[in-house]
Amino acid sequence: MTDRVKKTRKLRGHVSHGYGRVGKHRKHSGGRGLAGGFSHMKTFFTRFHPDYHGKRGMRVYHRKENSDYARPISSARLWGMIPKEQRYDFLDNPEKVPVIDVREFGYHVVVGGKLSLERPIVVKARYFTPSAKEEITKVGGKWIITY
């Protein structure tokens, strides 16, 4: 419900307007900046900034990310990496065999999984699991290790 008269109009004649005699709505009542994160503003920090306090991990300057982590992909998803128009060309012409370099898509390791199409396929990657090798060779395809 809206008020006919603002609060400031109601407080005319009351010197401090509800802000007290000494402080008079001045200075930094809650501390400056982000002060009080562990005491009087703790609820605010835990609700809106839960990771503000404390440490989290460590930066390793000399680590080579690529050698530490190689993103895997299932061999079941290999046919899905070929654009639709090209995929239909390969399905219509059995002599054509697609060559997929998974590193172009940001993957490095091919893991096992049933191929979605029982057609030969050539796959290039940094590493293949034994089950992935078996699955690719079973349909008459080839796997090539690239560095």
UniProtKB/Swiss-Prot annotation:
InterPro entries, per database record: Rbsml_uL15_N (IPR027386), Ribosomal_uL15 (IPR030878), Ribosomal_uL15/eL18 (IPR021131), Ribosomal_uL15/eL18_sf (IPR036227)
Sequence segments annotated as region (Disordered): 1-34
PANTHER family noted in UniProt: 60S RIBOSOMAL PROTEIN L27A (PTHR11721), LARGE RIBOSOMAL SUBUNIT PROTEIN UL15 (PTHR11721:SF3)
Coiled-coil ranges from the UniProt annotation: none
Family in the record: Belongs to the universal ribosomal protein uL15 family.
Organism: Encephalitozoon cuniculi (strain GB-M1)
Name of the protein in its database record: Large ribosomal subunit protein uL15
Signal peptide interval: none
Record Gene3D superfamilies: 3.100.10.10, 4.10.990.10
GO biological process assignments: translation
Biased composition (Basic residues): 1-15
